[in-house]
């Protein structure tokens, strides 16, 4: 392209952005200048013009307006290549606006309509993020966390070679850790109120189902506390033995060691039960 051609293209794009700048949410705009003022419907524009307007709104940090224009392309030019491109941008724009239900809906439509497209992996990743980005604190309802885990797992399994797989794996681990944190929070609540059996049930879930998370050492220590409080020394010693075998350098093991030795006990496997089974798995390298 010649220099004159490049300038002409730049002028044309600038004019299109200015022309669309006055577009309102009722799909019309007002023109002025040497012409009489008139309303021009959005339908009068080509899809690439509307698409550029959407990009313009994104650059202005107005994702809600951007999503509107991208959605209009899907409405006005369905089944076109511009509709395909606009749909993934619509999902992205809604996500930027923290409109997670609409982002998820747009991403799911993209996956349904274009399952083999290069952007399908990104659509699935956006769908997962629509759940994941709402996980903000341990005390929140865990339904979103389960949905995030499911969507992230699908991203990893369906698109293992995509550029989003690694990020999905990291977020999956964090969401998994979040669920374990919820169990720990409830377990501590019961432990403080001396509801030892209820507390043990929560800590057991962490040890059995979330053993790869960062909460496992504390869960084992809390089991030592709870079992000692109930006078169940065999289980307390076995929990301490598992803790010492896997996390000997942690303060949780040091605290458990002090508790056990303070009662003349040692952190060693004693008896059978569920902790005894885990200890045997630990020795064989089958646990954690």
Question: What feature does the model see in each segment?
Answer:
Residues 6-13:
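Sec-dependent signal peptide recognition
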Residues 15-16, 91:
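Enrichment for repetitive, rod-forming helical segments
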């Amino acid at each position: 392209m010649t220099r004159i051609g490049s300038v002409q293209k730049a002028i044309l794009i600038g004019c299109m952005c200015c022309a669309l700048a006055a577009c309102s949410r009722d799909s019309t705009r007002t023109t002025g200048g040497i012409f009489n003022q008139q309303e021009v419907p959005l339908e009068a524009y080509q899809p690439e013009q509307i698409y550029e307007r959407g990009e313009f709104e994104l650059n202005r940090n107005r994702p809600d307006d951007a999503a509107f224009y991208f959605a209009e392309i899907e409405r006005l030019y369905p089944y076109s290549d511009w509709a395909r491109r606009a749909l993934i941008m619509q999902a992205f724009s809604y996500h930027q606006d923290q409109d997670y239900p609409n982002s998820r809906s747009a991403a799911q439509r993209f996956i349904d309509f274009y399952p083999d497209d290069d952007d399908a992996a990104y659509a699935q990743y956006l769908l997962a993020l629509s759940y994941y980005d709402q996980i903000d604190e341990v005390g929140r309802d865990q339904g979103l966390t389960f949905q995030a885990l499911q969507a992230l797992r699908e991203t990893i399994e369906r698109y293992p070679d995509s550029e989003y797989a690694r990020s999905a794996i990291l977020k999956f681990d964090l969401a998994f850790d979040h669920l374990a944190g919820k169990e720990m929070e409830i377990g501590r609540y019961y432990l403080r109120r001396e509801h030892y059996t209820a507390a043990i049930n929560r800590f057991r879930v962490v040890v059995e189902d979330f053993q790869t998370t960062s909460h496992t050492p504390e869960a084992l220590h809390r089991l030592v506390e709870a079992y000692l409080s109930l006078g169940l020394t065999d289980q307390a010693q076995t929990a301490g033995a598992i803790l010492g075998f896997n996390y000997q350098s942690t303060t949780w093991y040091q605290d458990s060691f002090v508790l056990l030795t303070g009662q003349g006990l040692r952190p060693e496997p004693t008896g059978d039960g569920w902790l005894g089974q885990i200890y045997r798995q630990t020795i064989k390298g089958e646990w954690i």
